[in-house]
């Protein structure tokens, strides 16, 4: 066979050189090839084997090439995963059904789940059962959702950006309502484009790419591959350890549901990515609207340390008020406007610097938002220059923001005082809830995602509170005949 002769001819010089240099014959395999020249039948078998191996190698190389090409195209278009994940997410449903749920799953460690009370639900239910309460209705998960939650992933359903304790009277009127965070964005259109573009420049520049309608917001492939390479390199040299591959979607999962709001292992990062991807494809393969919601949720949910008298600070809106005394509505109005005077430009530069500094402080809030603002000021100045170079902001905004420093509030703004008489009934209800649910404080109780209905009549309670608040007015007391035996003994010194 021509192929066998060709192989033998090619190996002959090599075999001679091998024996000359090494002082011993080649391995039996090569010797076999050499001897195959003399045996026609073996020569034919060898040729057939060579052809078969060559064909296998060609097919394997072609398959690898096709797989590589397919992987690149899928990374660019996300067509396949958007189809599969949206169908999978569509099977993860739940519905309210009478009585306790047979497959209830509760979160355990996430800061969001702890704050809103979801992680404590088993304890709450047990405590209320001991007081004679019973579950009237509870959500029953579909088999797919139950399996997904049972394997430790986070629920793919829309979650509240704002929640708190709400109490109603017998007619459905609000007695008490606590909303945390207090200042939030209710939709994408409320956010100034300047804030959106700045956030994307810092965290996830291609998130809102409208040309890629099926984009998976849970992973940015270039950063992901780079992060994997850096992680592998770090196993050889720890100094080569680079940054992560977090996107806005996975960061939301992290500071809401991951234990202590951190990513401690690769397994936790995978859990964040899968959960974020399923949530993004919940409404179908087209994720553009879901990606806009991610921007809204991130701005409302990012954690920015805490302050005495204010508590934990969640979201850009509350952070502007707590750290700088700036109202979110005013900030939105000014950042959306076109400055027409030096004063308005200066104010826009001031507010933009505050917003930018908060977006940067999210990386290490306790460090950057400490009394010494030097590191945060320096980081903000660097980003102002980079943002202007990238044409995210105008040079005029950059210069106006460079010209100011971050304000320092000695004390965080406090909630407005409420008359004790007006709070008497609601405080009694809240105290009863503290005892029934075994919650530590009003602070924790008011941050639960909890709604309660009472037998109190609000008009009557309001009238009683009004009368009690005026008992220090002599004319009011005398006009209502409240002076006398077993009443007020005198109208003097009522105050």
What are these regions (language model features)?
Residues 6-178, 383, 474-475:
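N-terminal type II signal-anchor transmembrane helix
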Residues 56-59, 64-82, 86, 93-97, ...:
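Non-catalytic, structured segments within soluble enzyme domains
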Residues 120-129, 191-198, 291:
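Periplasmic N-terminal gating module of Gram-negative TonB-dependent outer-membrane receptors
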Residues 133, 162, 168-173, 180, ...:
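Solvent-exposed coil/turn segments that connect beta secondary-structure elements
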Residues 152-157, 459-494:
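Beta-lactamase-like hydrolase cores
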Residues 160-176, 191, 480-495:
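A short, well-structured edge-of-sheet supersecondary motif
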Residues 174-207, 271-286:
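Export/targeting segments at the very N-terminus of extracytoplasmic proteins
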Residues 190-231:
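Active/ligand-binding-proximal structured segments within catalytic/core domains
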């Amino acid at each position: 066979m021509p192929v066998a002769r060709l192989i033998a001819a090619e190996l002959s010089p090599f075999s001679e050189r091998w024996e000359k240099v090494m002082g011993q014959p080649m391995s039996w395999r090569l010797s076999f090839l050499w001897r195959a020249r003399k045996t026609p039948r073996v020569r034919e078998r060898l040729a057939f084997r060579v052809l078969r191996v060559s064909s296998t190698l060609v097919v394997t190389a072609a398959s690898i090439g096709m797989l590589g090409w397919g992987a690149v195209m899928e990374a660019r278009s996300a067509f396949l995963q958007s189809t599969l994940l949206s169908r999978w997410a569509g099977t993860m449903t739940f519905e309210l059904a009478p009585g306790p749920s047979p497959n209830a799953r509760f979160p355990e460690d996430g800061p969001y789940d702890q704050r809103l009370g979801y992680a404590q639900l088993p304890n709450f239910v047990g405590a209320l059962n001991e007081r004679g309460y019973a579950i009237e209705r509870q959500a029953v998960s579909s088999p797919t959702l139950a399996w997904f939650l049972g394997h430790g992933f986070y629920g793919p359903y829309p979650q509240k950006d704002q929640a708190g304790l709400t109490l109603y009277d017998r007619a459905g009127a609000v007695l008490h309502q606590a909303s945390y965070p207090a200042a939030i964005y209710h939709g994408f259109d409320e956010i100034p484009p300047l804030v959106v573009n700045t956030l994307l420049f810092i965290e996830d520049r291609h998130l809102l790419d409208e040309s890629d309608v099926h984009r998976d917001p849970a992973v940015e492939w270039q950063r992901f591959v780079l992060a994997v390479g850096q992680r592998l390199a770090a196993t050889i040299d720890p100094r080569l350890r680079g940054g992560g591959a977090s996107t806005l979607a996975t960061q939301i999962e992290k500071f809401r549901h991951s234990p202590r709001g951190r990513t401690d292992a690769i397994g936790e990062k995978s859990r964040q990515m899968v959960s974020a991807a399923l949530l993004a494809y919940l409404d179908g393969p087209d994720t553009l609207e879901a990606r806009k919601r991610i921007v809204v949720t991130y701005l409302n949910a990012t954690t920015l340390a805490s302050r005495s008298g204010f508590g934990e600070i969640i979201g850009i809106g509350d952070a502007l008020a707590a750290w700088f005394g700036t109202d979110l509505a005013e900030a939105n109005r000014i950042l959306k406007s076109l400055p027409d005077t030096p004063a308005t430009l200066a104010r826009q530069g001031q507010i933009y610097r505050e917003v930018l500094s908060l977006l940067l402080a999210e990386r290490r809030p306790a460090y950057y938002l400490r009394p010494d603002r030097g590191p945060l000021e320096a980081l903000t100045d660097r980003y102002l220059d980079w943002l202007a170079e990238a044409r995210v902001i105008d040079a005029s905004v950059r210069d106006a923001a460079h010209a100011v420093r971050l304000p320092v509030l000695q004390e965080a703004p406090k909630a407005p005082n409420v008359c004790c008489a007006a709070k008497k009934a609601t405080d009694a209800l809240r105290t009863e809830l503290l005892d029934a649910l075994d919650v530590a404080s009003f602070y924790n109780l008011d941050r639960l995602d909890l709604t309660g209905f009472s037998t109190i009549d609000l008009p009557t309670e309001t009238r009683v509170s009004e009368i009690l608040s005026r008992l220090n007015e002599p004319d009011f007391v005398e006009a209502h005949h409240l002076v006398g035996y077993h009443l007020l003994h005198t109208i003097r010194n009522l105050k």
